[in-house]
Amino acid sequence: MTGIAPIALGLDFGTTNTVIALSDSADESHLISFKGEDSTGEIFRSALCFWEEQSGWNGIASEAGPWAIAEFLGSPLDSRFVQSFKSVAASSIFERAQIFGRPFRFEDMGRLFLHKLRDHAGGQLSKLPSRIVVGRPVEYAGPRPDPALARQRYDLMFEQWGSEIHYVYEPLGAAFSFASWLERPTTLLVADFGGGTTDFSVVRVAEPGSSQRCQPLASSGVGIAGDRFDKRIVDHLVLPLLGKGGTYRSFDKVLEIPGGYFGDFADWSRLALMRNKRTLDELRKLQRSAVDPTPIGRMIALIEHEQGFPLYEAVGRAKRALTASDEAEFSFSGGGVEINTVVSRRDFERWIAEDLRRIEAAMDAALVKAKLEPADIDRVFLTGGSSLIPAIRALFERRFSVDQIATGGELTSIAHGLALIGSDANPAEWSV
């Protein structure tokens, strides 16, 4: 990069990770690298850690990204670790999280996250470009997502970042990035596999030098991605040890334990928030009436001992191992709970089979909207961490030839493309 002031900033605010790119021309962008003892380079984890401190805002201090992880690991019982909070952006059910008795709305957490992110950029973001391009999913995560509510919350989250803020579908950012490598006119299908959603865009790419290089034809998405695959692992390997499928006594009846507690426990965005007096009191009451109280006791212990992040890490290790091997060891130890078992890729693929069918249906919806058949697609670009899962790759290889499919920049391509869109003469053409 030269010393020229950047024209635009592209922000890929992801469910799992956040990446930022700056552009100073229509065909060049570079990533912001975060430096420091706990830094993970260009990838900033979309997570927050809170702890009580008199000098903090309203008596609560906070950290974000890899520094949030470091704070949590240093003092897990005295902190609250929140991750995947983007997943509740479009949820009308979520109003606020109670953290150490203080309410935090989505936009409160979002503004804190952005403030810490800028702090850790080491001056690279001290002066923001006038044009900010923020990625958003085509379809938000969660049951009955409300995109208008998500837009309102995003506006509040980003209101201090400038007046010219554009929201662009995340797969379009990846398409713009990949198009810079193409040397001939191409009909391109982009699939973005994030933490909370899977999104598709079909784009017509003109030859280099054209006045409008990329023309979006259609987009679609579904609220299923990496976190859902994690949930399947937790559902099959962890929750049966915590009381799922068990029963409790209510007067003269024996009833199945309600599934809501298990749904919350298997959702990374909600697990940390279960550590509150009301939920723990309800679980202790349930434990007293359970036919077998021991499993519910394990759940209570995991929540009280803040074992959400260690469990997340254990699930992630097993899932990553299954991308390269037919079997993986799932090993977790914490809160008095020990799990050591072997999981096969065949079992994992069986658990996520219905999720894959819904993902494939979303891809078909994008093609239908674009009025194209699979044979009309010249290239397919897969991005996002879950694109590395063999079953995901196989889904595309059934529909397209292997030499049509490209991968790369799984965690960074969207931010690159968003920054390039921001340097375009009229980014509003891409905005939604």
Please report, for each region that a protein language model flagged, where it lies by residue.
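Adenine-nucleotide phosphate-binding core of ATP-dependent small-molecule kinases
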Residues: 98-119, 300-308, 337-366
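Phosphate-binding glycine-rich/basic clefts of nucleotide- and phosphate-handling proteins
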Residues: 41, 205-334, 430
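Phosphate/ATP-binding catalytic cores across multiple sugar-kinase/actin-like superfamilies
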Residues: 112-125, 171-182, 318-321, 351-377, ...
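Glycine-rich phosphate-binding loops at beta-strand->alpha-helix junctions
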Residues: 134-147, 307-308, 375-396
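Conserved phosphate-binding catalytic cores of ATP/NTP-utilizing and phosphoryl-transfer enzymes
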Residues: 1-7, 165-191, 416-427
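Gly/Thr-rich phosphate-binding beta-strand-loop-beta motif of the actin/hexokinase/Hsp70
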Residues: 2-29, 179-214, 382
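Early-domain small/polar-rich strand-loop-helix modules and first-structured segments
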Residues: 1-96, 220, 225-264
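Conserved phosphate-binding/catalytic loops in two-lobed NTP-binding clefts
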Residues: 160-168, 375, 394-420
